């Protein structure tokens, strides 16, 4: 598993401890009842801290699933995701 994906899995596991590890890669805001606006802010804060990045409000509005967030992180310059 790629390092970025592994680190993102850890962020999700912290924000949503009720999820089994194998559930995380397929989770989205629409599929997880506990992913409300507060949980979303918490998740994005964890991601910003873990990856040392800032996520703009415009970008955050589209980050509605594990897969979309992973794609977003993979598009960052390599040094930003280290």
PLM region descriptions:
Residues 1-82:
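Phosphopantetheine-dependent thiolation modules in NRPS/PKS and related acyl-activating systems
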């Amino acid at each position: 598993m790629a390092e970025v994906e592994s680190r993102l899995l850890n962020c999700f596991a912290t924000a949503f401890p009720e999820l089994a590890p194998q559930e995380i890669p397929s989770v989205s805001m629409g599929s997880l009842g506990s992913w409300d606006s507060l949980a979303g802010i918490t998740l994005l804060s964890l991601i910003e801290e873990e990856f040392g990045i800032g996520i703009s409000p415009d970008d955050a509005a589209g980050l509605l699933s594990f897969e979309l967030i992973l794609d977003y992180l993979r598009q960052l310059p390599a040094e930003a995701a280290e």
